């Protein structure tokens, strides 16, 4: 997904990929995607390297990031997407190998600073290793910021109805740490834990301790939804809330936070470029201080 997104940007060039898969299989996985469709471009393998749209991409299969010699291909930023090197100490091996910056594509396992577009990018101070948090946090944080900035959040609960992930089982199987997580993904709605709501408190300190949440894993291949239920400090009608979110989506958060009043369903957001889209028709208000936002 990172690779496909980068192909649409003129200011990003992929120069190297490190994976334990061989280059032929990597080319196959890039060409064909059951969820996002076929790759719109040319993909071939030559002398162990990927050639994508005529551009050569170095392919390596190193287990230790320190051996990657990123400086040989002029790497500026490494997207650390293995899910393994999620601390400053382990991710710093990429810096040792010659990279200038490292972005962890999930939450870190230590105090590596976390940045979410639309929430706290203005706090970035040049750190060489950062976390981009989770997909759920990227969905929740921009909306939570708009609501808190305009109306104040006293407290809130979040539920994410989350699409199936690769760690789940196709049929029931052993899962010693998470018994429910071991049940068949295509057969069940599976309650699960998530740290996404609490992580919002790291990127928006003013909300620290005010939000928590949980997840339901559901049998859909892509697109998840966040249900945010909050108590407001400043009373507001649902129409006022919609207006505030729409203004942000068309203003300072354009391209990050979207807004729709259409009768949409999850597949309508397959390939959506905004990290969060407010579904104006799906939310409800019990009163002017207690609302559910989707």
UniProtKB/Swiss-Prot annotation:
**Subunit organization:** Homotetramer.
Protein's job: Catalyzes the oxidative phosphorylation of glyceraldehyde 3-phosphate (G3P) to 1,3-bisphosphoglycerate (BPG) using the cofactor NAD. The first reaction step involves the formation of a hemiacetal intermediate between G3P and a cysteine residue, and this hemiacetal intermediate is then oxidized to a thioester, with concomitant reduction of NAD to NADH. The reduced NADH is then exchanged with the second NAD, and the thioester is attacked by a nucleophilic inorganic phosphate to produce BPG.
**Where is the catalytic site?**
135
- Top class in the EC scheme: oxidoreductase
**Hey, which pathway is this one from?**
Carbohydrate degradation; glycolysis; pyruvate from D-glyceraldehyde 3-phosphate: step 1/5
GO BP terms: glucose metabolic process; glycolytic process
* Entry keyword set: Cytoplasm, Glycolysis, NAD, Nucleotide-binding, Oxidoreductase
Q: Which GO terms fall under molecular function for this chain's record?
A: glyceraldehyde-3-phosphate dehydrogenase (NAD+) (phosphorylating) activity; NAD binding; NADP binding
**Residues annotated for D-glyceraldehyde 3-phosphate binding in this entry:** 134-136, 165, 194-195, 217
**Pfam families per the UniProt record, alphabetical:** Gp_dh_C (PF02800), Gp_dh_N (PF00044)
Q: Which InterPro entries match?
A: GlycerAld/Erythrose_P_DH, GlycerAld_3-P_DH_AS, GlycerAld_3-P_DH_cat, GlycerAld_3-P_DH_NAD(P)-bd, Glyceraldehyde-3-P_DH_1, NAD(P)-bd_dom_sf
Record protein name field: Glyceraldehyde-3-phosphate dehydrogenase
The answer to whether UniProt assigns keyword Cytoplasm to this entry is yes
Q: Which PROSITE patterns match?
A: GAPDH
- Resulting phenotype, residue 153 to M: In strain: ATCC 35471
A single GO CC term, please? cytoplasm
Q: Where does NAD(+) bind?
A: 19, 63, 105
> What is the taxonomic lineage of the source species?
Bacteria, Pseudomonadati, Pseudomonadota, Gammaproteobacteria, Enterobacterales
Report the EC code(s) recorded for this entry: 1.2.1.12
Subcellular localization, per the record?
Answer: Cytoplasm
Residues flagged as site, Activates thiol group during catalysis: 162
């Amino acid at each position: 997904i990172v690779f496909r997104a980068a192909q649409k940007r003129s200011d990003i060039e992929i120069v190297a990929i490190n994976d334990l898969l061989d280059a032929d299989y990597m080319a196959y996985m890039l060409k064909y995607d059951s969820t996002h469709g076929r790759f719109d471009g040319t993909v071939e393998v030559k002398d162990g390297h990927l050639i994508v749209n005529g551009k050569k991409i170095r392919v390596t299969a190193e287990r230790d990031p320190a051996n990657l010699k990123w400086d040989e291909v002029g790497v500026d930023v490494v997207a650390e997407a293995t899910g393994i090197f999620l601390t400053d100490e382990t991710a710093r091996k990429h810096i040792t190998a010659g990279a200038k910056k490292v972005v962890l594509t999930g939450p870190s396992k230590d105090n590596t600073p976390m940045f979410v577009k639309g929430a706290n990018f203005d706090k970035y101070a040049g750190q060489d290793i950062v976390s981009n948090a989770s997909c759920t946090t990227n969905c929740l944080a921009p909306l939570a910021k708009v609501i808190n900035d305009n109306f104040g959040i006293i407290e809130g609960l979040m539920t994410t109805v989350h699409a199936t992930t690769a760690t789940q089982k196709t049929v029931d199987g052993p899962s010693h740490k998470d018994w429910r997580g071991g049940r068949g993904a295509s057969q069940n709605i599976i309650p699960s834990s998530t740290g996404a709501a609490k992580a919002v408190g790291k990127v928006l300190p003013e909300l620290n301790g005010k939000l928590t949440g949980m997840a339901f894993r559901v049998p859909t291949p892509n697109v998840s939804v966040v249900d945010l239920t909050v108590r407001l400090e400043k009373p507001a009608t649902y129409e006022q809330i919609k207006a505030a979110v729409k203004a942000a989506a068309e203003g300072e958060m354009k391209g990050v936070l979207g807004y729709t009043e259409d009768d949409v369903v999850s597949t309508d957001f397959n390939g959506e470029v905004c990290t969060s889209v407010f579904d104006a028709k799906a939310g409800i208000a019990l009163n002017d201080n207690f609302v559910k936002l989707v």
